[in-house]
Amino acid sequence: MRHLRTAPVEHPGTFIVEELEARNWQQVDLAYILGMSPPQLSPLLTGKARITPDLAVALGHAFDMPAEFFANLQKLYDLHNAKPVDPGVRTRASWLAAFPVREMIKRGWIEDTEASLLDLQMMRFFGKNRVEDIPFIGSGEIVPHAALKASYERTTAPQYVWLHQVMKIAETMTVAPYSEGGLTSALKQIRAHLRDKDDLIRIPEILARCGVRFVLVEALPGARIDGVCVWPNGQPAIGMTTRWDRLDNFAYVLRHEIEHVLRGDGREASFAPVDEIGAEDDPDVARPEEEAIADRAAAEFCVPQRQLESFVLRKSPFISEQDVLAFASRVEIHPAVVIGQIQRRTKKYNWLRKYQTGIRQYLFEWKYVDGWSRRYPTGL
């Protein structure tokens, strides 16, 4: 692109000298008017001294002109002679306006280096060859698969960054070839391991044997995301945030994403819709059919819905703790999962809250964890 050259800007003293000539004044005359000696005035006329706000007011009175005129002369001259702006300022500002760059640096996903390398790092992170192909900053499409567009319209920039980190980690994993039949058969075993929090670490291993990669990545601030099903290199992977750090939420999100895998949702698009559990309660959000199907599968997996409905009808409005424990034993699931399902139905989220304790730490033995002061090396 051809560089434009701006016209030179004379120092303000040049105009003052011209004004003196137009009025047939001598420099000593102006010095007298301003109440200063000629040696004090000389640096101003030769551009060696600046027009201060006080001097701009005085010159305005001397020449019967607005003080702003002289102040603007000085401002234009200063701007013209300012040091060239670091081109990295615009580069960093453009990326920061679109993506949580500082958080990405903090998490170790990109390096804090000179701006000239920022474009390259971001293209490499998103797997693009041109900045223009990256959504939110260029014209790249977030939705390569039209059938899923309604859900992708809710995808935010922090969510988009997060799911790419999930994919980058998943690409480093080696698992068995994906087996739909194997995954379906493993559901009962996965559910059995939900009864004891100490057994949760076994679930990622079961998924790996079925050819499904499991990745745990802490959500970025404001991302509002619970999980996603991605297909890097055509092999399924499940990414989760454990945003709510509760067993009922973990079980629900896990089974929800497994259903996406079993159905092949997003396989042609690299990733299925990012999932925010609870978004289905928003009447203004249109959810695709595959999301409703995954919701039903997740709910049935957690607690058989007919049995749950019968239990709630029989015991309402006063469901005792002992009733819940007995029912959870009967359906062979941890009480926290039953309580979570009833809380969702009744909207009473403080009910038996003591059972909703954290589960995230039970998964930290899994190698493929990023966040919570842990960094998974994916290369830059």
Describe each region flagged by the PLM.
Residues 2-380:
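Active-site hotspot residues in diverse enzymes, especially metal/ion-binding acidic/histidine motifs
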